[in-house]
Amino acid sequence: MTTANAYKTESDIEAAVVGLYSDMNPYPGDSWLYYGGYMIMITDYATDMGYSTAAGDPTKLSNMTYDASNRYFSNNWRDMYNVISNANTILDNVESIDMSVEKKNLVKGQAKFLRAMAYRDLTDAWGPVPFITSLVKNPFTLNDVPLTPVSEIESVLISDLKECINILPASWSGQDLARATKGAAATLLGKIYLRNHDYTNAKTYIDMVLNSGEYELESDFKYVWSENNKYGKEMIFALLHETGQNAAEIACHFGPSDHPDVPGRWQYYGVSLPFWRSYDKEDPRREFFYYDYTGDSKRDDKSNYGFHYMIPEEGVVDVPNDTTKYMQNVATMKYTYDMISDAYYDGRTICVFRLSDVILCKAEIENNLNGPAAALPYLNQIRGRAGAPEYGKNSRFPVPATKEAMNDAILKERGYELVFEFQRRADLIRFGKYEEIVNAHLKKLGIAQPTNVTSDLRYFPYPLNDAQLNPNLANENPSRLPK
């Protein structure tokens, strides 16, 4: 079977579209690739947000000592291009299928949206990349494919996403609930404009989402993450899974270690203690972590109780007794809240875009176009929903007086609200704070020189295996490595 004869009927092309969604969380024996977990390492982990206790590649990313051989680079690169390749195959074949124009448009809209997602992720991480928009029949031609500037890639993505907005539905239902929509396409388009600080165009598409009437904040921020609310009214685009279909193992990797209520999880991806400590103590989201509990496993053969796991006060190293263990990082509850199944393949929903993110994008846009007063209601909308002290309503949180101060407040809020939702690194870079905040974080941890992160590290090195095949990638890598 080849691409020339595999797509003959409407059911063939529809099966390919379903497969394209599964490519966002591929399952080659482990269901934790790309948005299933690996994506977190090149978004939130290589910042002040993540801290690894695992040896090797995870630690090298969280302490900024990575090199081009890091598996999180090669695997994410491969999986992003797999989405692109399969989307290109669909788009190259759909016109020859005997089906209505309306159905063809739905196929094209979904394929172009998911391809745009993959290219947005690639350009966030690596900047200029090989830009391929049709099926590659001879893979050897890729060995010297040139790097396309980000601006040229974006011009195509912008055109594609505008088309997606026109041809995708406002919503789907039933088993199709998690497919791409107008709102998802508008969100991605708004974010691409925002990445370039094009606030006027970003406002057009962010407002389109906010004014659509399709989305609504949950009254309780925790309920966003409940398994009883798998694709709730706040979700704009998410990857929906079912336990019985060997789908997603995100709870295993993000869940707490040795916890009695969430057994069998690994805490492989943990939030750094300095980041967790930076939450205001009156912010209920601070409590949405597993930071103080008695372990499920007995301490030893003579005890009926587990260790007491807790976070030490800053600067404290020595544990008070032999029944206590200090945690080196802390697990979020987002991917284990209201667990329905203890199965290894947990079936958890993986959020990609949700309304609170878009509202904070609106705050950012209004601040940069019209100043702090215009941004304040949107910032406080998210803090108010969470139950955190609001700016201008609490003496400890005066209204930021300048655009710069308001941007700082919005950036902090994005971190607290969107922790471990694949946002932090792009946010820090967009706000011009990446070097400053990550260097301060590394200095606090004592694991690197305070100048370890420079502007050269805006982009990651191209994966070693690919760079060995393509000199255009190899030539760029020396400047992209931590010194």
Residue spans for each PLM region:
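Elongated scaffold/linker segments in the mid-to-C-terminal portions of large proteins
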Residues: N5, V17, N25-P28, A46-D79, ...
